[in-house]
Every structure is written in structure tokens, then in C-alpha cells.
Amino acid sequence: MRFNPQDWKEKSHTNFEGAWHDGPSVITPPGEDKKYPRLRYTRAQPHPIFATINRLREIYLSMGFDECENPVIVEESDIYRQFGPEAMAVLDRVFYIGGLPRPNVGISRKQLDEINDILQSHRSPLVHGHEIPAGDSGNKEPFRPMSRETEEQLRETLHAYKKSEIDGDELTHELAKVLGVDDGIVVHILDSVFPEFRSLVPESSRSTLRSHMTSGWFMTLGSLWERTPLPIKLFSVDRCFRREQAEGPTRLMTYHSASCVVAREDVTIEDGKAVSEALLSAFGYEDFRFQPDDKRSKYYMPDSQTEVYAKHPVHGWVEVATFGMYSPSALGEYGIGVPVMNLGLGVERLAMIAYNANDVRQLSYPQFFPRLAGDREIACAVHLREEPVTVEGKALALAIARVAAAHATEQGPCSFTVWEGTLYGRNVNVIIEETEANAKLCGPACANEIFVHEGNILGVPDNEKWKDVRIKGIPTGISYLSAVSALAAANIEHAARCGTGTQVQVKMAKHPGDINLKIEEYAMRTITDTKKKVDVRGPVFLAVRSEIAE
């Protein structure tokens, strides 16, 4: 809370020791949600794939490679130019781009009558092609069918759509303007009167989505190599699309390729080895091994396609990249007259190693594979249902817990004044009491504390039986007594605002709500999915009463 520094300065000069001991009075007592482990200073987590991409970009730039964006849409003819006779096998794994054709929509008299019927059923306030007679307005105006002018405008609009002068996402709005009705009515008309829109079948083009970055490099280098000083050193980290038979733990239909090219008159396969080491050593790889790749893609020179194996301190030898020298036959198709070394690696592959993942689907799309919450996360998900909101109310909750703990074993009937103060401008007295003879002020479970152990939420006492839970479990920082004290203080606060006293009594606890606990849904989902439990049962038997003082 705010405090007057001048007052504390004078207080310190007058009685330093007293001022020092009174220092905690300026601290606002934290509610349970403002206590550790629920109080956390966290940072947002980047996606592992994009974190890997950012590292790759930084490393490439530090190596002197300029960043480039290659075309994503590649014509089928380019695949033939790059792969030659091998193109047919490659095209089996690409996605062709298709779209819906524009229907040739004609409007017969029957269809115009159907449109009029729909317009009449909705009673459009607009009158097509007519003046509204004096004295008539709104729904008083009798419906009139579309005028010839409106019918012709309707035909022209549909014809413009057929000729692609109007985009598909604009058609509904344009028809609504012609008919003078709401867009929703036009949607009804298109669905009911023009069934040809619903029977459209996609048609494929000869354009494909890039299946590997090489497709783009040939086009880029063909445009640049005679207009840019050599050497040309470019990199690109971007998506590729491959029509796999099925996605699995190591394969996705869309993935990220981190690829680079070096074009100069004396570039050789040795450049591929040097680039591999410079790039991958930044990821912690310590040694490298190069061996011929059996796949022998036709856009590479014979015997130049090379697999890169790198030794990781944790994972050992792993395959991480491929490089090779572009074939002059493929380069010649694009008019490129200089040797080119190309290196590529799969970002997802690199990220799987870096993040110890065994399923690329789970690494790329974690939202579809929600992980189970750990004990600490579950502990953070345990909150109080009700808490006091004022500084006085929070101090009251602490006072209730303190007095109850101090007199927990007192035999009833007994009562103790907990707090006397002001709430919402009213003088309030708070008493903790036990009215029954031979009953203790607090039940034995009041001293229980909430721990999370091996996925279970448990309320346990401090004894030998539960020693393992208290040592190995994660404490929530909440006891039965602190939770019930907060409940009592919140209710007393509310009653004082209304000008009345109240009584709060908790007896046998069976469920979390009985002791003022709530558990976040995600934590409960983990507990139920793993067949764990929430056990906060116990005899609490605590009664707190407030009264408004005169």
C-alpha cells in the first residue's frame, strides 16, 4: 500500500527500533492467489519450430548469406526442366493447385419468379423500380416484383462474376445491392434458386506448391546470376509441401526447409562440407561425417549428393543435412552458367533433436496433443473460491487463522475475540467460538496442508504417515485453516457492507469446495485422465461469528 515517507522519516528519527519493527505494516497482506506458487513471473514460450528457424536465420546471416524468399507456387513445366525424365516420379508427391470454376449462371423466368417469392416472403422494405406512394411507408407498402431494370442488373452482375470481374467473396454483397436486400437473403436465394453453385467440383491447374526449396532456387538464380556480383550466397527458411501417403512421427505434408546456395566459378563440394560445419556447430554438434547419398537426385551432378552426419554430445551421430552440386543440365534450363552448391536441411528434423522429441506432429502442433500437467502446474491450479478484497479483510483472515491456531485445542464451550476494527465504515467485532461442551475449538484437520504428490491433490497433516508426501510433494501454500479463514473473512466483509453480522461454520470436509478450494479445469482434466485423486477430507469444525458494534 502507499505510505507517507515524511511520517516514516520522522518516526525513524524519534524511535528507530520501533519504526523498524513497524515496517511490515505498510505491506498489503497478499491473498492466496498472490502467494507462491500461484504467484509466478513467467515469460511466454516461443514455438520450437519457429525458435529453431530464428536461430538458423541468425546463423546464416552471421555466415554472410543474404536472405531470400523463393517462389512458393511452381509450374509443372519447371519440375520437368529441373528433373528431366525423373519429373514424373517427383510430381507424384506434389500438391497441384485447384479451384472452383465460375458457373455460367443463366436466369430463366422460372428463376426470377422464385427470387420474387423469396423477396416477398422476407417483405423487403425497398420497392424495385417504383416510387413509394405518398402516405405509404415500410410494411404498409404492398410488395411489387422486380422491375425489368432490376432483372437486367441481376443478369449483368452474374455475368460479371462469370468473367471474374467480381470476386467470389464480393458476389453476395453485389447482388444484395442490386436487389436492395440484406446479404442473408441473397445467401438464401443463391442456395435455393441456383443449385449449380452447390454442385461445383474443383478443377486442377498445372501449378504446384513447392515440394522442395530447389525448385525456387533455379528460378531465383536464373534471374540473378548475370545481374549480381559473384559469389552469390543466399539462404531461405520457408515452408515446403509434400503429398505424403500419410503423416507420421517423422513426416508431415508441410514442413520447413532451411536451404542455401553458393554460386561462383570455383565452388566445389568442399564448400558444402565447410558450410555444414559452420551452420551446425552453432547447434552444439562437435564432429562431422560425410557420405554419398544413395537417392542421387537428377538435379545434382553425379556423385555429388552428400548426406551430413553430425555428432551431438547427447544424441550421438545423427543425419541432419544434405548437400550437392547442381547439374549443369538443370542449370542450363534456366540460363545459369556458373557452378552452384546447394545445402538443405529440415527444420523439423533439427528441432526434434534439439527438443528431444519423438513425434514431429506433436512438436509442430502441440495444441492437438495436450500434455499432462506436472505436480508444480497442478499446485499452481489450486486456488481459493472466496477471498476478502479489502486490506482490512485480508488482515482479518490472517487474524482468524492466527487466533484459531493459538487456541486450537481449547475445550468448549469457549470463545475468543479475533478482531475489532472497521469494515466499510462500520465497527465490526469478530469472534471464533465453540459452543459444544468437551469439543475442541478446531477440528484436527484444520492443521492439514494441501500438497500435490505424483499427480494427486492431498490434504495431509504433519505426521510420520504423510512424511513422504510432505517431503517429495509440491506444497500449495494453503492449509485448511488459511482457506477457511479467508472464506470467513470474505463473508464477514460482505455482511459488513450490508450492515449486518454473520456466522460461518465449516464442519466435515468432503469436497474441495467445503474448505473454500477451487481447482482449475486443466488440472482436473489431468487428474481424471491419469486416474489420480483429490482427497481433502477431514474434520474441520471451525465456527466464526461477526457482529456490528454500536
Curated annotation (Swiss-Prot):
Domain of life of the source: Archaea
Sites where the protein binds substrate: 212-214, 257-259, 299-300, 342
MF (Gene Ontology): ATP binding; phosphoserine-tRNA(Cys) ligase activity; tRNA binding
Swiss-Prot/TrEMBL keywords: Aminoacyl-tRNA synthetase, ATP-binding, Ligase, Nucleotide-binding, Protein biosynthesis
Substrates-to-products reaction catalysed: tRNA(Cys) + O-phospho-L-serine + ATP = O-phospho-L-seryl-tRNA(Cys) + AMP + diphosphate
Enzyme class, first EC level, given as a word: ligase
SUPFAM superfamilies linked to this entry: Class II aaRS and biotin synthetases (SSF55681)
GO terms, biological process: translation; tRNA aminoacylation
Region annotation Disordered: where it falls in the sequence: 1-32
Keyword Protein biosynthesis recorded: yes
InterPro entries named among the record's database cross-references: aa-tRNA-synth_II, aa-tRNA-synth_II/BPL/LPL, O-Pseryl-tRNA(Cys)_ligase, Phenylalanyl-tRNA_Synthase, SepRS_C
EC id: 6.1.1.27
Oligomer status and interactors: Homotetramer. Interacts with SepCysS.
UniProt family annotation: Belongs to the class-II aminoacyl-tRNA synthetase family. O-phosphoseryl-tRNA(Cys) synthetase subfamily.
Function: Catalyzes the attachment of O-phosphoserine (Sep) to tRNA(Cys).
Full protein name: O-phosphoserine--tRNA(Cys) ligase
Organism: Methanoregula boonei (strain DSM 21154 / JCM 14090 / 6A8)
Taxonomic placement: Archaea, Methanobacteriati, Methanobacteriota, Stenosarchaea group, Methanomicrobia
